[in-house]
């Protein structure tokens, strides 16, 4: 499942806000606890727990933090593939069609695209096998 929220800054507090506003509520609505999260080693995700908003948020919510290896993007291949897909299928298409005067309008269009991506667009790969991310999640819950 892909979750996105647009921000004007790339900070630990915005990373924690994404989890608080979008990610944790979604998985809670599915009856699934968030036990672990995988991120890269960006400064918005990594720091000392007592001084870092994102690390503190994870600690308060009892979420284990796993970090990708330092250099190879293959470690987080699913995320890297999503970055390519959102660039090609959303941003490049959207910015050719429309000029945005504010972040809220762009977020609204992104939310619409994400609903399609998660619920209607079939995905290839060993985990999805032509299913949508939501179908993959629901099938996984049945196991």
Residue ranges and their predicted role:
Residues 34, 64-65:
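Hydrophobic beta-strand scaffold residues
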């Amino acid at each position: 499942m892909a979750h996105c929220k647009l921000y004007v800054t790339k900070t630990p507090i915005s990373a924690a806000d994404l989890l608080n506003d979008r990610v944790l509520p979604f998985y809670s609505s599915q009856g699934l606890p968030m036990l672990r999260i995988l991120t890269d080693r960006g400064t918005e995700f990594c720091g000392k727990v007592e001084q870092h908003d994102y690390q503190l948020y994870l600690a308060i919510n009892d979420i284990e933090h796993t970090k990708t290896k330092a250099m190879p993007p293959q470690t987080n291949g699913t995320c890297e593939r999503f970055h390519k897909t959102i660039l090609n299928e959303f941003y490049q298409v959207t910015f050719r069609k429309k000029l945005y005067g504010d972040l809220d309008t762009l977020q609204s269009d992104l939310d619409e695209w994400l609903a399609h991506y998660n619920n209607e667009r079939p995905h290839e790969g060993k985990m999805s096998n032509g299913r949508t991310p939501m179908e993959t999640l629901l099938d996984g819950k049945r196991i």
